[in-house]
Design a protein with these regions (language model features):
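Compositionally biased terminal segments of proteins
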Residues: 1-180
Length: 180
């Protein structure tokens, strides 16, 4: 998803929900910290988000902008309405969210704001998900110098998951770091 597509889907979410502030927790949250991240980090066609002040209205995002919606069919990308529990990011992630104002669209009265996971929290939440593409994402952020290995490793103990999963995340990160 290109940065302009991210802005478009956020603006559309504002129109669909009547909300202006959204928390972005998926891979597109990288666009909160970096205007032009490496192309390899922008492969997803989905923006995972929920309205900050009314997370329950995330269903309206799925209905209007979700996978298979008219919006998706028209533009080739879509939004996935999620909830605050979706992000398995290190404790305190809510205090580290990165604010990105989205330009107002023509004929819109909404001024959307994306509150994006801070990049280290984003990478660690993807590591918890643990799919191959998530590990590739983590490796690419390290390779591109977008995250610090020391910060990632320091936040692993703060992940809200079982100890065995935290240990696995740390082992995998150390393996990736050693390979760079």
């Amino acid at each position: 998803m290109r940065p302009e597509d991210f802005e478009h889907v956020l603006a559309a979410a504002a129109e669909a929900t009547g909300q202006d502030e959204f928390v972005v927790v998926g891979s597109q949250a990288i666009l909160g910290s970096f205007a032009q991240p490496p192309e390899a980090l922008l492969q997803s066609l989905e923006a995972d988000m929920y309205p900050l002040r009314d997370p329950a209205s995330a269903d309206a995002i799925d209905a209007a902008l979700g996978d298979g919606s008219q919006f998706h069919l028209a533009y080739g990308y879509y939004a996935h309405g999620v909830g605050p529990e979706t992000a398995k990011a290190p404790n305190g992630w809510q205090k580290r969210l990165v604010r990105r104002e989205i330009p107002r669209r023509v004929a819109s009265t909404r001024s959307p704001v994306a509150w994006c996971l801070e990049v280290h929290d984003l990478v660690l939440s993807k590591c918890v998900a643990g799919r191959e593409r998530d590990w590739e994402y983590a490796a690419e952020t390290l390779r591109a110098g977008l995250v610090g290995a020391d910060v990632l490793l320091a936040r692993v103990p703060d992940l809200p998951v079982a100890e065995d999963l935290r240990a696995h995340v740390e082992r995998m990160l150390r393996t990736i770091i050693a390979s760079l």
